Amino acid sequence: MSRRPRKRHVQLTLDQARKPDGRHGGWRPHAGRKPKAGSISHATRPAEPARFPQHVTLRIAEGAPSLAREGLMKIVRAAIRDSQRGAPQATQGRRAHRAAAADHNVTRELTRRGVSADHGETSELASRGGFRVVEFNVLGNHLHLIVEAASKDALASGVAGLEIRVARRVNAALGRRGKLFPQRYHARALRTPREVRNALRYVLLNRKHHTAAQRFGRFWIDACSSAPWFTGWAQPIRGDEPWKRELLALPPPTAPPETWLLATGWKRHGLLRFDERPG
């Protein structure tokens, strides 16, 4: 009985491996695991000059409750305020102790992630130009931020610190475990006055982008955003409803802009109107 010849295994060159022969697969256009919807590329982020504000988007984990609910909205707003104003210095007694412990946990988590905690964690650092949240809008499953950052590292550590702070507080309030922000954040530099104005309109009036226009009055502002404290409206905000008066009486949770583009430059194209819609 004759033996079958032993199969010869031939080592393919890289060029051969990239050209499928119809039997063995190989590299093909659009082959492999498909990216998840809404996922962000893990390519290295470019280092943007500090003079350019950035539009940052944070997506919430699937299945997590809407952060635009009133109770959670207050938690997120407080986290934004504390991330750049230094909560321990603004509180007393046990509240100060809890705030200091929370800041320590944020710093420890940043260290575990391998992210520098040298930027954007306290009001002292914010005043040195590390990381500032200038405007925001909290929607059901994502957050829009307009921020200023002194460097690429300042942006990374500032966003990471804010994510940790929001996640810890929201999870504690809900008795929830697990990541609240599982995806990488998206960031886009705003390089011109027109780009900055468009981004401000998009962030502050974003709810109009998702909801029918007839739901909004002529002087409507979004209670889940920084619109009540925004100083670039073409008309003064009317305190004609109790919730507006309540918000207007609060100190701003955001930081004032320091870049020319975000403080002054965008106004060349006109102040924002309440009746505008995001593009």
Task: Please tell me what each predicted stretch does.
Residues 1-54, 58-59, 64-140, 148-279:
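Short Pro-Cys-Gly-centered "Cys-loop" motif that presents a nucleophilic cysteine in a tight turn
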